[in-house]
């Protein structure tokens, strides 16, 4: 009886070794590509909060230059970030996530002196918020993350219940009334609801300011479509009807709430003193960086530099170019016409040895439960965003879609 049980165990053991060499599914490139294309279709619609592609209208003969400018600057920023990472060999993200960070709070610079009335260039359609981060310049290379936080006040008199506000990085421009800008993020807010904090990731903008002081021109808060009226609940646009921001922000719209009364202005400032717009900077202390031991040799990156020049059946990055018109049947995305989405595929074999008991247990589990395989899968590791310029009706819109471009893979 004991010999029989031993024989069964060895048979299962050897079978498990063979099974453990497989990935989550059979390597069928055509199938992987079809699934990736359909996943991208769903991703784009989901990230834009659309249930179906917008109705198609004839594209305008010429896109407004200011729209093209925003698209180009946002696209170029993403490319600069990618180039910077490749050129400087940045610290591994695992180090940044592991070590404790020091947090610094930097309040917004006041618009005007304590007893003064705002200047005449105060705009009804946008707000400019500035910060002095010069004190942090000596620690610029240690910046891990920066968040812009602003408190939305309840506006019970708001004419609309919802508005989509957008945050831009202000760029150099000849005209103060019409600054250049780079899109960062957007949020839909309920204007009449109880006040709340809104947070935006502004790491890249602050990183740029710390290295180039002259580029620190602040942030711009504006509506999604100041030249029209945008209805977030159904993505409907009313053209040629300018919309004013109904969302109010502590420390920014104090003058609006005080109706020009200096006494009321002081009262509002005191009331919301703890809710001033501010930056939260998270830095990795220098002494923690200096105390790190020299890192061990890193694993070979399963990225384009390696995978595209080596024929691999194992887990690797696979090239895939998506043409929006050809592959998705879409004409509503104006720029780009397509992009290199890529995908991960290939086997993830276990490293088998007599002392790897963990692998032995996983393999036996894989044999007993084939439908719930514990084998590692080939998945994406590094992803980059994609900027698109598209139309809803005749209105151009620019969006940055996160995690759309696969840059490297791993077994997990």
From Swiss-Prot:
Q: Where on the tree of life does the source sit, at the highest rank?
A: Eukaryota
- A Pfam family of the record is TGFb_propeptide
Its signal peptide is 1-20
Keywords for this protein: Cleavage on pair of basic residues, Disulfide bond, Extracellular matrix, Glycoprotein, Growth factor, Mitogen, Secreted, Signal
| Any one Gene Ontology BP term | transforming growth factor beta receptor signaling pathway
Which SMART domains does the entry mention? TGFB (SM00204)
Disulphide linkage map: 307-316, 315-378, 344-409, 348-411
Q: Which residues get glycosylated?
A: 72, 139, 240
**Which is one GO molecular function term here?**
type II transforming growth factor beta receptor binding
GO CC entries: axon; extracellular matrix; extracellular region; extracellular space; neuronal cell body
What family does this chain come from, according to its entry? Answer: Belongs to the TGF-beta family.
User: What is the protein named?
Assistant: Transforming growth factor beta-2 proprotein
Designated gene of the protein: TGFB2
